[in-house]
């Protein structure tokens, strides 16, 4: 199983990073180790050696069939379910890595950093590019977005990634986060929603 993720893919989050909207020439792709996956409502144990850990709330797509060099017009045939996940990030470390021109994996791919919610059949939704989602932290909404605000759409991303990697059943795609990232602390309670459906519920330890 491979875990792909996209950076700077939402309009307002992109602006907050650059001061103005700066669409990358191509999608910004990074990966997480399979040991990053955290599911079934298991608690997230905050690492004590990575500094400030922040949540990034994202729509996640599940790949459902083998594919390579997939044309964009056929990309919708290669995923079957969607949910909300958290891309936990060691923010201070990521900043240092970016400044040094180094990859982000140490700040993004550590154990437990890819939290995943309950899968929902893609057929439940009319348009994957019109999904509203949000994160509640200790009963307060702290991050919300809509997939219509993506700079690169799901089918574009899948087509692009498949030019370099063979996609396999069960691979995951974290599609980027809206503005509103923030820190987590021990005993925090995180609940995420896809439209009005609760798909993720876990605690930090």
Residues of each region from the PLM?
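Catalytic-core "active-site belt" of small-molecule-metabolizing enzymes
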Residues: 1-168, 172, 180-205
């Amino acid at each position: 199983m491979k875990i792909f993720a996209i950076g700077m893919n939402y309009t307002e989050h992109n602006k907050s990073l650059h001061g103005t909207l700066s669409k990358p020439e191509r999608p910004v792709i990074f990966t997480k180790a399979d040991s990053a996956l955290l599911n079934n409502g298991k608690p997230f144990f905050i690492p004590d050696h990575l500094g400030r850990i922040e949540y990034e709330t994202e729509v996640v797509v599940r790949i459902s069939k083998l594919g390579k060099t997939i044309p964009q017009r056929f990309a919708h045939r290669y995923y079957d379910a969607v949910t909300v996940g958290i891309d936990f990030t060691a923010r201070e470390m990521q900043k240092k890595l970016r400044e040094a021109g180094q990859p982000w994996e140490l700040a993004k791919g550590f154990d437990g950093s890819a939290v995943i919610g309950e899968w929902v059949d893609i057929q439940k939704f009319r348009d994957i590019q019109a999904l509203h989602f949000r994160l509640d932290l200790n009963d307060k909404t702290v991050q919300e977005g809509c997939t219509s605000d993506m700079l690169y759409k799901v089918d574009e991303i899948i087509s692009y990634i498949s030019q370099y990697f063979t996609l396999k059943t069960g691979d995951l795609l974290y599609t980027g986060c809206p503005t509103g990232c923030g820190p987590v602390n021990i005993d925090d309670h995180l609940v995420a929603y896809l439209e009005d459906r609760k798909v993720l519920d876990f605690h930090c330890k």
